[in-house]
Structures are given as C-alpha cells and as structure tokens.
Amino acid sequence: MAMATGKATEEEQPEQGQQQQQLQQQQKQTTLQSTYRFALFFIAGCLAAFGFHALTSSSGSLLGWRLRLHHLPTAHYLQTRDEFAVYSVDELNAFKEFYDKSVSDSVGASLSEAEETNIKEAMGALRLAQEMYMTGKDDKAARLFEHALALAPKHPEVLLRYGEFLEHNQRNIVLADQYYFQALSINPSNTEALANRQRTADVVQLLDERRLSSLDEKRDALSAIHEANSALRRAKKEAYFQHIYHSVGIEGNTMTLAQTRSVLETRMAVDGKSIDEHNEILGMDLAMKYINASLVQKLYITLKDILELHRRVLGHVDPIEGGEFRRNQVYVGGHIPPGPGDLAILMQRFEHWLNSEQSNSLHPVNYAALAHYKLVHIHPFVDGNGRTSRLLMNTLLMRAGYPPVIIPKQQRSQYYHFLKLANEGDIRPFVRFIADCTEKTLDLYLWATSDLPQQIPMLIQTESDGNVLAQLQSHTSSPELYESGSGSGAGAGAGSGQKGMP
C-alpha cells in the first residue's frame, strides 16, 4: 500500500507542474492583452487630443467646425467681387479640366432620369433661344430663356447665356450680374462668367450706391414733414394696420385688412376665424408697441431685447415658447438651421455683430436687411422667427429715421426666394428686395402728405387678393439699368426693382 501511494504521488507531481505552467501562460496572455488594450486606448487618446487641438486652433472655439457648417458671414457682406476674381484666366484654365471632370462625374452619378431629361430639354431650349435672339426675335428668345432656366435653374451654361441676354438685350445689368455670380458659384472655372462679372461688378456697385442715396433723400424729405401734419398722422395709422396685416399674412394668416383693423380697434372676435389668427394679430400689436416705447430709443440691441420682442409676438399664441430659444432641431424647407446646442454661441455672436462698429458703418437699409437675414437664418425659436426678424429689421430702420417697412404678403414667394438665394451665397438680391420695399413704403408716406389726390395705393385698397402694389408697379423712376434689379428666377424679377409713385 505504501509503495502504491508513493507512485501515485510521483505521477501527480508532473500534472501539477503542467497546470502551473498553463496558469503562468494564461497570466502572461492576460498581461499582454491588458498592455495591448492600454496601448490602443493611449493611441486613440492621443489622436483624439490631436484632432481636438487642430479643430480648436483652426476655428478659435470648440464649436468652430459646427459653426462652419452653418456659416454666417461676418465680413464683406455686400462685396460685389468674390474670390473668383483674384484668379487669372490662365490659373483657372490650369485646373479647369480636372474640375470639369470631377463635377461631371459627381453630377452624373446623382442626377435622376427626370433631371437628365430636364437638362436635355433646357439645353435644346437654350440653343433655340440663342437662334431667336440672333435673328432679332427677342420676345420669343426671352420666353425660351425663361423656359430653359425653369427646367435647369442650376445649370451654369443656362445662367451664363440668360445673363448675357439680360445684359445686352434687356439692359438689366443687375440681374445679369446675379446670374453670372450663380454660374461662378456652381462652376468656378467658368471663365466667361468670370469675365462678365469683372465687367459688371463695378457698374452694379455704383447702381446699388445710387439707389441707397435715393432712399436717403426720400427719408430726409419725409423727416422734414412736421409730426403734427394730419395727413402724415393718418398715413402712419393706416401703415400700422398694413404692417401687421401683411406680416401675419406672410405666415399664412387669412384675416383681411378690414378684419385685422377691426381686431386691433375693437378687440372683438371675427366670425369664422381661428383663435390663433386673432392672437397672432394681437401679438404683433404688442410687439410693435414695445418697439415704439422702448427699442427705438435704445443705443444697443441686446439678446434680452430680442427675447422680449419674441415673447410679445407669441404672447397670445404660445406663451410657454415665447421669449425662449428652441430646444429641438427644426427644418425649414431645404434649409436646416443650427442645432439647439449651437444657439447660445450663435446668438451671442449675432448680438456682438448687431452692436459692432462694422455693422453700424453700413447703410441703414443694408444693416437692417442683413440683421433680418442673419436672425432668420439662425432660426432660434420654434415659431415666430419671421415676424421677429421683420420686427427687428424695422426697429433698426426706425432708429435711422426710416418708417417701418411693409413687405406685401402678395410678394411672399419673392421674399422666400431671395432668402433662399442668400442661403446659397448671394445676399445682394435680398438686400435689394428690402430696398424696394423701403422705397415703396417711403413713396406711400410722401404721396399721402403731398397735394396729389389722396387715393393712396396700399393704404386705401380693396380687399382683393390681387396685386396690392399694382398702382405702384405701373410707375418706375429707376435708372434703366437697374430695372427689375432683384428679380427672381423665371420672369426676371417681376415686382421688384421698381419704384413707387413720383
């Protein structure tokens, strides 16, 4: 028995040694795995730190990369020349072949069959339009150019040729320059568009400056009229109703002008209209009174002022959201505003810009239009962004001696079209549109206080859904080259670039 036990012990010793070796190997593997994981984490951390440093150093802030996605220009707002003008024709030709190939490859891969069909039809219409133009059939050529533009509004060749037609045949150099700009934005290597812009840029800048000087003269003429003038007081009262009527109408309110006036004067409900439509009118009334009583006299506009303005706009419609930044992502047609996490820093930058020397050095109309665009682009609220932006714009204009500008609800499509163009990189058409509305509003006041018959367009009008500005648009006092200067798409700027009654 003792010998058997000894043999068993001798056999167990090798087995125990093998188990110890296996345990040691497992421990080594575990140690290696831990070391490997640590090394991976360390490398990943270094890469993350390097990326973070690169982003913050290039943008100046943690949110710089996100701000670039929602870029709001902070310099050279109305510069008529762009970065393409600094390149020579030879430099552009140097990378033209590569650029054209990359663009055609990317566009060709993304175009649908319907879009390809539209482009083919547009190019056919474009060729026919040029033939009509060369044979002197200008009316047919104009319709064909507009048809081509409607089919392919982003095609550089269509934009270029239509711009040339507008410049040389229609003498509409402002709109032609706008199309050259769009063609260059889509295809920077388009040397013809570049050459055309280099020719038109100075002329367009001069026309814009003359237009602003004309607005200043009309503002000064209006300022010279004594406040006690009874006609001026009547015009201001009627314009007040008009301003609220059109501003809520742009957002879809169906109240007529007479109903809007009734709600404001009597505070009585109108049969067949929703509570929200009543409350939108009352909110605008509160906001306008706040502007007249407080903001117009202030030297600086703060975020608190903007929030107070918005709180009154939504005070009757949505008092919970009124005066509060949105807390969720919103989508506005094809525009995706910044996320809620970026609103604080964007609005702080907006406030800084509003009160900066740079912005205050701009012409008041340019300044007000840009403030409107910047605020509506950020879209800081769940609702009421458009109304608040228009109210802020008018606050800035009133501080400069201008009356509150009326944007007619019948021009809603143009208004949104110019905002869309601004999102695409060209703010000038929107600024010109605001200048148009400013001039028409000034003309209404001057007309009302003149010795001419007191049938005031837009201040005394029928309740039709037709053209509110029909009488104004039948008269133009603009330079020929400036006619329809802020046109939109097909139709070449209907309803814009025209001035009011003499």
Swiss-Prot record:
Biological processes annotated in GO: detection of light stimulus involved in visual perception; histamine transport; protein adenylylation; response to endoplasmic reticulum stress; visual behavior
Keyword Transmembrane: yes
Residue spans of the TPR repeats: 122-155, 156-190
Gene Ontology CC: plasma membrane
EC number per UniProt: 2.7.7.108, 3.1.4.-
GO molecular function: AMPylase activity; ATP binding; Hsp70 protein binding; protein adenylylhydrolase activity; protein homodimerization activity
Comp. bias regions, Low complexity: 15-24
Active site: H379
Motif Inhibitory (S/T)XXXE(G/N) motif, residue range(s) on this chain: 247-252
Superkingdom assignment: Eukaryota
Residues at which ATP binds: 251, 332-335, 383-390, 415-416, 423
Biased composition, class Gly residues, residue ranges: 486-502
Membrane-topology descriptor: Single-pass membrane protein
Record field: catalytic activity: L-tyrosyl-[protein] + ATP = O-(5'-adenylyl)-L-tyrosyl-[protein] + diphosphate; L-threonyl-[protein] + ATP = 3-O-(5'-adenylyl)-L-threonyl-[protein] + diphosphate; 3-O-(5'-adenylyl)-L-threonyl-[protein] + H2O = L-threonyl-[protein] + AMP + H(+)
Localization, UniProt: Membrane
Record region (Disordered): 1-24, 478-502
Function recorded in the entry: Protein that can both mediate the addition of adenosine 5'-monophosphate (AMP) to specific residues of target proteins (AMPylation), and the removal of the same modification from target proteins (de-AMPylation), depending on the context. The side chain of Glu-251 determines which of the two opposing activities (AMPylase or de-AMPylase) will take place. Acts as a key regulator of the unfolded protein response (UPR) by mediating AMPylation or de-AMPylation of Hsc70-3/BiP.
Family per similarity comment: Belongs to the fic family.
Protein name listed in UniProt: Protein adenylyltransferase Fic
Organism: Drosophila mojavensis (Fruit fly)
Lineage: Eukaryota, Metazoa, Ecdysozoa, Arthropoda, Hexapoda
